């Protein structure tokens, strides 16, 4: 008879807690997100920004076909990390809920309502047999009365953020946000911060493998930045990084001079 580890029963069944209160399949779904491409979101007074790493593994892939930021409604967008197919199901459900709300009430859906609907669906997939948790997390951004930014977890939990990152580069990006985020930053500064944080998590950042979208308070419309716009912001950000590195080196040398 083969040896069966003590936790195997809790490991296989989505509806059974382990003795220490964990649902292993939910934890594994989170691991799928941690291994996914990095996605970041930044909120400011003028709007909200989403930026995502596009992991293009072959030069034969058409970059435009590799979509990681999705329009949910005119005023709502989502960026994904984790299993893309799972994210697509969640995005389609969010689009459906947004249109149902618009047809029922004659007004754009509040972002918080859509986020709750999606997280209710995620939570259901942690509670019933015959299903598995969604191996994807979404950053959901939008503008109703004001800019809003939410992170949705595979467990069904959701949180509102000023700036947040998901995916493999989460720790690096969050450290940058903790240091550089300002409540009074402009939309352009928010775009630069999002691209800077994302670029720091990538080996070779370029306009081709970065996707950026914005929703402004002024028009409440979703818009993706063109490759030329992304390249302009990326060049400005990388130039600032190089200047900072040179300044740090000069400071280091000045400290050495004090020993003579």
Swiss-Prot record:
Q: Which UniProt keywords apply?
A: Cytoplasm, Proteasome
The UniProt entry's GO biological process terms, in alphabetical order, are: proteasomal protein catabolic process; ubiquitin-dependent protein catabolic process
Q: Is Cytoplasm there in the keyword field?
A: yes
Spell out the activity regulation.
Answer: The formation of the proteasomal ATPase PAN-20S proteasome complex, via the docking of the C-termini of PAN into the intersubunit pockets in the alpha-rings, triggers opening of the gate for substrate entry. Interconversion between the open-gate and close-gate conformations leads to a dynamic regulation of the 20S proteasome proteolysis activity.
- SMART domains (UniProt xref): Proteasome_A_N (SM00948)
UniProt xrefs under InterPro entries: Ntn_hydrolases_N, Proteasome_alpha, Proteasome_alpha-type, Proteasome_asu_arc, Proteasome_asu_N, Proteasome_sua/b
| Signal peptide from the UniProt entry | none
One Pfam family per UniProt: Proteasome
> What are the annotated GO cellular component locations?
cytoplasm; proteasome core complex, alpha-subunit complex
Region ranges (Disordered): 241-260
Q: At the top level of its lineage, which domain of life is listed?
A: Archaea
MF terms per GO, please?
threonine-type endopeptidase activity
State where the protein is found: Cytoplasm
Subunit structure, as described in the record: The 20S proteasome core is composed of 14 alpha and 14 beta subunits that assemble into four stacked heptameric rings, resulting in a barrel-shaped structure. The two inner rings, each composed of seven catalytic beta subunits, are sandwiched by two outer rings, each composed of seven alpha subunits. The catalytic chamber with the active sites is on the inside of the barrel. Has a gated structure, the ends of the cylinder being occluded by the N-termini of the alpha-subunits. Is capped at one or both ends by the proteasome regulatory ATPase, PAN.
- Which family does the record assign? Belongs to the peptidase T1A family.
What does this protein's UniProt record list under function? Component of the proteasome core, a large protease complex with broad specificity involved in protein degradation.
What is the protein's name according to its record?
Proteasome subunit alpha
Q: Which gene encodes it?
A: psmA
